[in-house]
Amino acid sequence: MNKIKISLVIPAYNEEKYISSCLESVTENGGELYEIVVVDNASTDRTHEIAAGFSEVRVVTESGKGVTRARQRGVQESSGDIIAFIDADTRMPEYWVGEIIKDFEIDEKLVCLSGPYIYYDVSSLAKVSIWFYWSVLARIAYLFTSYMVVGGNFVVRREALEKIGGFDPNISFYGEDTDTARRLHKVGKVKFNQKLIMYTSARRLKGEGFFLTGYRYAINFLSEVFTGKPITSKYKDIR
């Protein structure tokens, strides 16, 4: 079997606070990656400068605001047959890339792979609640739909993503990951691997509140599943 080429795409908007830690984890633990592309999504801070300081990283610019537009630019600017997406406030575990390679090598029908978030900056009580969500509620949702994607922790086959027309630029934030998963499910297998953990900040949970954030994610997930479109069109940038 030919060696899998994995391109890593990281959308970034005003991420000067987090991007360095993210890229340090990527360059330390992503040795098997084919390339690393940071998409500066019209940042007004030092995001571009900081990312460009990593010799292993290529920085490109997308002036159209929105994570779907930034991800699509990353697809266009990358060349791997497998494209992985994480967020700029994440920290990559050392086994993450290896888990991707294993899953895609053993299953030719697999077109999309995702896994859970683990928040590295929340209380012990919050960690228990989040563990319950991933261990129970997320499993039920996946069994019901056969697809689930976490926007800052997923991987796709380029061929499959191109087949569905890429990301929907009309969806700015909420529901964009479920929209992508739902459409990819029509062309192949979408797997949610509980072992494919990505560490991330809890800035949105802290900025909007645990329950409000959970509600918005849940209601837009259900709306995408049953109507094919999200309910919430506006979102707040929390940095």
Regions picked out by a protein language model, each given a short descriptive name:
Residues M1-S25:
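N-proximal low-complexity "stem/linker" segments adjacent to membrane-targeting elements
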Residues S114-D121, K127-G151:
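Short, flexible, basic/aromatic active-site loop/helix in glycosyltransferases
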Residues Y95-L125:
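Conserved donor NDP-sugar-binding/catalytic core segment of glycosyltransferases
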Residues I83:
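Short aromatic/hydrophobic "clamp" motif used to bind/position activated sugar donors
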